[in-house]
Amino acid sequence: MKYRDLRDFISKLEADGELRRVDVEVDPRLEMTEVCDRTLRAEGPAILFQKPKGYRMPVLGNLFGTPRRVALGMGAEDVSALREIGELLAFLRQPEPPKGLRDAWSQLPVFRKVLDMGPKKVRRAACQEVVVEGDDVDLGRLPVQTCWPGDAGPLITWALVVTRGPEKERQNLGIYRNQVIGRNRTIMRWLAHRGGALDFRDWQRERPGEPFPVAIALGADPATILGAVTPVPDSLSEYGFAGLLRGSKTELVKCLGPDLQVPASAEIVLEGHIHPDDTAPEGPFGDHTGYYNEVDHFPVFTVDRITHRRDPIYHSTYTGRPPDEPAILGVALNEVFVPILRKQFPEISDFYLPPEGCSYRMAVVTMKKQYPGHAKRVMLGVWSFLRQFMYTKFVIVTDDDVNARDWKDVIWAMTTRMDPKRDTVMIDNTPIDYLDFASPVSGLGSKIGFDATHKWPGETDREWGRPIVMDDETRARVDALWPKLGLD
């Protein structure tokens, strides 16, 4: 099923029993986090808080709190169907030349579908039904959550940030948290390698001293939100990918101020600018690591205008020790990653990002090993192939007789197939998540790979062990005998 906007998705979830409305007063300060955290850990529904304490605007929480709801948001019925989305993205990243005329004709519908999904510009939009400008702008009217007791203040978490570098036609969409520090000011926390930060850097180089236009969409349709966190190939915009997921073009409307296009169906849009010289200390905030992050300086976003729908809904979340919503998103998007990796490395059988590893800090890869040193090639490939794995600190590679998603299997392989000196690869001075306080330098640290595969001649001089497996005849006899044993 496809969803026109966030409200359409809410209606679908409610009809399926996947969303509950809460009419009891709940405080956006701390209480909503505790309610959502307990609900997520119980694999419970999305929550629409209809009476946030001190506010008239309802708050939507725990929207992507189960892998199935992530799949539904991407237009699929279950998580397994996300492999098809990954296969499409893998094809678009590296389309193979047609093998003949018939093959060329068979590929034509795919390219036509992609070309037809460019965004559609509209003049009027629901997100601009109400306009608030100048001195009337007050972020304090939004029920922004303060998530944890040690947080520096309210934090906008599902901010879909829209930017464009100088002389660029294509806009960048990224989700960057924003700390509210005043009536019309937030701190934009984007890391140096992210698209928004790169656009800002280019702007400063080309137009020094000039304010950088920025817009933030809150409460976009699920396809647009999820398109911003999916590994979309450079040849396809996030808006175009959202159109593919939705099955219809993403409708965009020009901001009333900056020359930027925002999702027409968004609940709320913040329009404004960042001045190159305006920064402020951001944090601390409880993060997906389970710890409070360090305080660091980031640009200040000044909000010049707020536009929104009539009776808008504020979409929010929290981050904390896994499982949290980012971890659940990681579990679902894992299925998108697998076909993309297999396209580049056909020997890969499965790929798994354990949610306990903060969504991306550890990866387990199973493969069909074909030659000595093969596992090391694969682990180096994982680190370098997709931007999403730039911060993956630990990569475990093992044979395809191991279940990558079963820790008992993985630990067995590591403890029986590895020599710590021979089978580890350590790389120093690599990019590391700024939130990773374990690294010796902020943003720079090491990575380690574990080769837990069977060793081939050339990797060892010893006779390799043979796994213990019961023969099929005995298993069949015991299967027939089992009901008579009274052991169930």
Curated annotation (Swiss-Prot):
<dbReference type="GO" id="GO:0005829">
    <property type="term" value="C:cytosol"/>
</dbReference>
<dbReference type="InterPro" id="IPR049381">
    <property type="entry name" value="UbiD-like_C"/>
</dbReference>
<dbReference type="GO" id="GO:0005886">
    <property type="term" value="C:plasma membrane"/>
</dbReference>
<feature type="binding site">
    <location>
        <position position="172"/>
    </location>
    <ligand>
        <name>Mn(2+)</name>
    </ligand>
</feature>
<feature type="binding site">
    <location>
        <position position="238"/>
    </location>
    <ligand>
        <name>Mn(2+)</name>
    </ligand>
</feature>
<dbReference type="GO" id="GO:0046872">
    <property type="term" value="F:metal ion binding"/>
</dbReference>
<comment type="function">
    <text>Catalyzes the decarboxylation of 3-octaprenyl-4-hydroxy benzoate to 2-octaprenylphenol, an intermediate step in ubiquinone biosynthesis.</text>
</comment>
<keyword id="KW-0831">Ubiquinone biosynthesis</keyword>
<keyword id="KW-0288">FMN</keyword>
<comment type="pathway">
    <text>Cofactor biosynthesis; ubiquinone biosynthesis.</text>
</comment>
<dbReference type="InterPro" id="IPR048304">
    <property type="entry name" value="UbiD_Rift_dom"/>
</dbReference>
<dbReference type="GO" id="GO:0008694">
    <property type="term" value="F:3-octaprenyl-4-hydroxybenzoate carboxy-lyase activity"/>
</dbReference>
<comment type="subunit">
    <text>Homohexamer.</text>
</comment>
<dbReference type="GO" id="GO:0006744">
    <property type="term" value="P:ubiquinone biosynthetic process"/>
</dbReference>
<dbReference type="InterPro" id="IPR023677">
    <property type="entry name" value="UbiD_bacteria"/>
</dbReference>
<keyword id="KW-0464">Manganese</keyword>
<comment type="similarity">
    <text>Belongs to the UbiD family.</text>
</comment>
<protein>
    <recommendedName>
        <fullName>3-octaprenyl-4-hydroxybenzoate carboxy-lyase</fullName>
        <ecNumber>4.1.1.98</ecNumber>
    </recommendedName>
</protein>
<keyword id="KW-0479">Metal-binding</keyword>
<keyword id="KW-1003">Cell membrane</keyword>
<dbReference type="Pfam" id="PF01977">
    <property type="entry name" value="UbiD"/>
</dbReference>
<feature type="binding site">
    <location>
        <begin position="189"/>
        <end position="191"/>
    </location>
    <ligand>
        <name>prenylated FMN</name>
    </ligand>
</feature>
<feature type="binding site">
    <location>
        <begin position="175"/>
        <end position="177"/>
    </location>
    <ligand>
        <name>prenylated FMN</name>
    </ligand>
</feature>
<keyword id="KW-0210">Decarboxylase</keyword>
<keyword id="KW-0456">Lyase</keyword>
<keyword id="KW-0285">Flavoprotein</keyword>
<dbReference type="InterPro" id="IPR049383">
    <property type="entry name" value="UbiD-like_N"/>
</dbReference>
<feature type="binding site">
    <location>
        <begin position="194"/>
        <end position="195"/>
    </location>
    <ligand>
        <name>prenylated FMN</name>
    </ligand>
</feature>
<dbReference type="InterPro" id="IPR002830">
    <property type="entry name" value="UbiD"/>
</dbReference>
<feature type="active site" description="Proton donor">
    <location>
        <position position="287"/>
    </location>
</feature>
<dbReference type="Pfam" id="PF20695">
    <property type="entry name" value="UbiD_N"/>
</dbReference>
<dbReference type="Pfam" id="PF20696">
    <property type="entry name" value="UbiD_C"/>
</dbReference>
<keyword id="KW-0472">Membrane</keyword>
